[in-house]
């Protein structure tokens, strides 16, 4: 018994039907990255360069930069305030973060706060996140982010090292690069990523 019109249905799942010429499987739907920041322009050159730029142009990855100031309710779109519970310095208010994440719809992946006090980012995190359909990165600035963002919004809190940055944007670039290069088809073949030193246990 044939199929109408002589067409046969491919029995493989739709997500894995297509092969790249290099032999690596790819997922037709792009992996979505949301980056919440008060400095979206900090990512301009990085998003257009190297592997990430190619992955975006090839439809493999979609990166959306969300301007946190757009969700500020203050007259001058301010996003900083004194720390909740007291303390020195200024921190980013929690409300714009909550509103911005809510505007993205129901989360389909981890919501990661990039913070100096977070757990150290490791290759295992990049591998785990490369399997997600979506990843949301929250970039702090000033002294820090209001603690309520870490307690009630982020699913994870990570740092890229024991040093101080002026904001979470450089850390977000590190995470994006580490995750995107692991996506099937981005490097051209699986051996390119599986031959990395961390895969080899070094």
Where are these regions (language model features)?
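Structured adenosyl-cofactor binding patch, chiefly the S-adenosyl-L-methionine
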Residues: 145, 149-196
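Long, charged alpha-helical interface segments
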Residues: 199-202
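Short, solvent-exposed amphipathic alpha-helical segments in soluble enzyme
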Residues: 50-54, 127-131, 152-153
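Compositionally biased, low-complexity flexible segments
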Residues: 1-24
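N-terminal nucleotide/polyanion-binding subdomain common to many enzyme families
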Residues: 25-104
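S-adenosyl-L-methionine/SAH cofactor-binding core of RNA-modifying enzymes
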Residues: 92-141
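Short glycine-enriched loops at secondary-structure junctions
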Residues: 68-71, 141-145
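Hydrophobic/aromatic beta-strand patches that form the interior of the parallel beta-sheet core
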Residues: 34-36, 64-66, 110-112, 135-137, ...
